A protein has these predicted regions:
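Juxtamembrane transmembrane-helix boundary motif
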Residues: 1-53, 74, 80, 104-192, ...
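Transmembrane alpha-helix interface/packing and boundary motifs in multi-pass membrane proteins
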Residues: 51-61, 189-200
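Residue-level signal for conserved functional micro-sites within the alpha-helical transmembrane segments
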Residues: 57, 94, 98, 121, ...
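Transmembrane helix boundary and interhelical junction motifs in multipass membrane proteins
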Residues: 60-69, 198-208
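Interfacial segments of multi-pass membrane proteins
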Residues: 68-82, 206-221
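Transmembrane helix-bundle signature of multi-pass membrane transporters/permeases
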Residues: 84-92, 223-234, 290
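Conserved small/polar residues in nucleotide/adenosyl-binding loops
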Residues: 347-354
Length: 357
């Protein structure tokens, strides 16, 4: 028995090593002959950005695009379209490696959330590329990114500091899974997919922030689940940009391969660090990062009074949405408890009647 476990463990290690060798081979023989190693001398800020970017993608549920997008747009002053395509490209490698690692190591995920949110996300990415991307300006993309990050921050803050009691009743899978649950997950995935089509990230953030609240699924289970959603969404988004919607931004195509060897090292390091820290420490780090990101957006864009009112209204609407979501979750949870109590009581009554006869 012990030998069998040792063999299985060694097999997993071999598969992971082969996966990393395969990715490095693609980078070394597929991308670098076209790009050239001298690109590191002229584009060094991009791979340097992905050192913290890759770490954050492993340390939190956010993909590497959550770091690269604001840094590229606000610090390096690069085009938002380039930042979006870069995020899709680098996540297609980094998040896919993470997803394969999760599956090989049999880390617990909520399979139904992964399946239906991913299906919804792919549909949303296509829809967003057709109807939303053509009308989005770079300025609006930056504001939208801050709204997505703010949504995550609000849900994280409320879940951690305002509704502590509900954490006693979290579960590893969605209880009372019905057809309407499938519909809800498809819609959640669709919304995340639309954001991903515009920003290069978002499917994981939206799925995580809503499912943890609405269905009370354990964050430790949803974290790897959201990685799988974002991995498939990134690959789908990149392929759509390449073959359906006119190709990816030329600067992104020449830049994201430079960061591939970095993210496949930094992301696992981030995951290891996160596993050793308490949840509250990770939450505080995330909230600090989110406040800095939102503050830098308002500072860099110099919004007019009317724009500030619109953004403020959106943020207020976001708060209201999550409070409603929390209350709906409370009602949904209490109703399920009452139904379970009735079901158990009815079963006991029938058993008593049968034994009496």
């Amino acid at each position: 028995m012990w030998n069998r476990r040792k063999i299985m463990k060694n097999r997993k290690k071999v598969v992971l090593i082969l996966m990393y060798c395969f990715v490095v081979s693609i980078w070394l023989f597929g991308f670098m002959p076209k790009i050239g190693f001298d690109s590191y001398l002229t584009k060094y800020p991009i791979p340097l950005t992905m050192i913290p970017g890759g770490f954050v993608s492993g340390f939190t549920i956010c993909g590497g695009g959550a770091v690269s997008f604001p840094v590229f747009c606000k610090v390096l002053k690069l085009d938002a379209m380039m930042a979006r395509d870069f995020a899709l490209g680098i996540q297609s490698f980094g998040m896919t490696c993470a997803a394969i690692t999760i599956l090989i190591r049999k880390i617990k995920i909520e399979k139904r959330v992964a399946i239906f949110c991913t299906i919804g996300s792919i549909i949303g990415i296509f829809f967003g590329n057709v109807y939303i991307v053509p009308i989005m300006s770079s300025e609006n993309m930056k504001i939208l990114f801050s709204m997505v990050i703010a949504a995550f921050g609000v849900s994280l803050f409320l879940n951690t500091f305002c509704f502590k009691e509900r954490r006693k009743y979290i579960c590893e899978t969605i209880s009372d899974f019905q057809m309407k649950t499938v519909g809800a997950l498809l819609i959640i995935g669709f919304v995340g997919g639309v954001f991903t089509s515009v920003l290069g990230t978002g499917a994981d953030i939206i799925a995580f922030s809503i499912v943890t609240i609405l269905f009370r699924v354990d964050e430790k289970v949803l974290n790897p689940t959201s990685d799988i959603i974002m991995a498939v969404s990134s690959v789908a988004g990149l392929l759509m940009r390449m073959y359906v919607f006119g190709g990816i931004h030329k600067d992104a195509a020449a830049s994201f391969p430079l960061a591939i060897p970095i993210v496949i090292i930094m992301a696992p390091l981030g995951a290891i660090m996160a596993s050793k820290l308490k949840r509250l420490s990770v939450v505080k780090f995330l909230l600090f990062f989110i406040v800095i990101e939102i503050g830098s957006t308002f500072y860099s864009l110099q919004l007019g009074n009317s724009q500030k009112i619109i953004v403020g209204s959106l943020f207020a609407g976001l708060l209201l949405f999550y409070f409603i979501l929390f209350k709906f979750s409370e009602i949904y949870y209490r109703r399920n408890i009452m139904e379970n109590i009735r079901s158990v009581s009815y079963t006991h009554l029938r058993a008593h009647e049968t034994s009496a006869h």
